[in-house]
Amino acid sequence: MSDLDKWVLHGDEMRRPLLVNPKLGESSKLVIVGGGLSGLCCAYRIAKKRPDVEVIIHEQSSLLGGVISTWKEDDWICDVAVNASRPHPAFWRLINDLELGEILKPSKSDAKSRWILLDGKQHKLSWRTLFKIGPMKLLRSIKKARMGELSVAQVIPNKQIADAMCLGIVNETSENVDADFLFPSLTKFGQNPPVKKSKLNKLISKSYPIFTPKKGTIASLEGGMQTLVDTLSEQISNLDNVTVFYGNSADSPSAIATTYDVPLESVIWAAPNPDIDQDSSKISIFAIGYTEQQVSHIKKGYGTLIPDVEFPISGILHESDVHASQRCSKGHRLFRLMVPHNRWDNDLNSVQECAESLLATNPIIFKKIGERQIPHYKPGHMSKLSQISLDCSYVGWSYSGVSITHVIDQSERIAELF
């Protein structure tokens, strides 16, 4: 496969380090530690491509799927973790191969607007946002960022806007987030494509199965993202060369290699690295719903980011505005609230009071639907990945990032080695 072909398949994911032992592709038997989305995708891609390779999934819990889950109550539907995918052909290819194309829907055309709450006022993100940041300051910061290992705060010279962007993606403020990790194309991290960006984008656009997404849209699955991991789990269970073992912890890659009698290079570690001290933050997710009349004053859009630490809520996502598939009954609207634990006193009332002040009083439903733990990606994260000893291979959220496209594309790149 040519370098250009790889870039058409994977796009800017090619900039991210692939933490794979060079002998992995020679394995006749391999063990994947972790049955979350990353582990499931790796197992599916490798097992389908190489029916002669024995694939074992070692999952410490009693269920596959990891952090991906969808909350449902009556007609209300809300994803607890990832709720959609940005345009990337790897996600489209997986959905197509799983025969889920009929339930993959682009986001609604009237829900593109995004806002940031700045000094108590909603600011719509647009080209005008550049003037709040300062175009010349931004240009100088971007040039400086190409030296590597800078924080997002050092690249985006407006703390509130930089914090909002980071909180919306990794639940952390901008001084603690690696700019190379969040904007590898902007900082020119890693290798560059062999053709101009405009030409590459045209080639990538032509490669989508199912439908070609429009610029600025996202896509989601009818019924929520749990459908994806449920379908992966079901299809993997029907593959003769895949076995899943549940309920046992995994102390280290070497211990797993001994347990399953495989060489260390045949272990894929799809879990946090036990040898790396990677901090994390916790966030609670709430669903809140109203009649359309109650929130008629709330403009339709994608959502609002809130960098101000005086608010327990860091983001409000307009779930029913964005998704083309039903998220609530007709005549209602559903919102998802993101509540970082370092901004919250653990009192449910404080979240509801804040939400009501920002949306409307007397919601029809208000419920905490889950908690999640998000790894930190501190400045220098991407550079440090290249220093990891690759006695085995590493995949997943802890390395690539929290976007669903990262881990799905990562599994394709690994399967190419077989």
Model features per residue range: what roles?
Residues 47-71:
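Glycine-rich FAD pyrophosphate-binding loop
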Residues 2, 248-353, 357:
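Mid-domain catalytic core of redox enzymes
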Residues 194-254, 262:
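Helical element adjacent to the flavin cofactor pocket in flavoenzyme catalytic cores
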Residues 82-90, 141-161, 209-234:
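Short beta-strand to alpha-helix junction loop
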Residues 2-24, 319, 325-418:
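Conserved flavin/dinucleotide-binding core of flavoenzymes
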Residues 24-38:
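Beta1/beta-strand and adjacent pyrophosphate-binding region of the FAD-binding site
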Residues 6-7, 66-91, 136, 141-142, ...:
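Glycine-rich active-site loop/strand segments that organize a redox cofactor
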Residues 87-198:
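Mobile amphipathic helical/loop "lid" adjacent to a hydrophobic cofactor/ligand pocket
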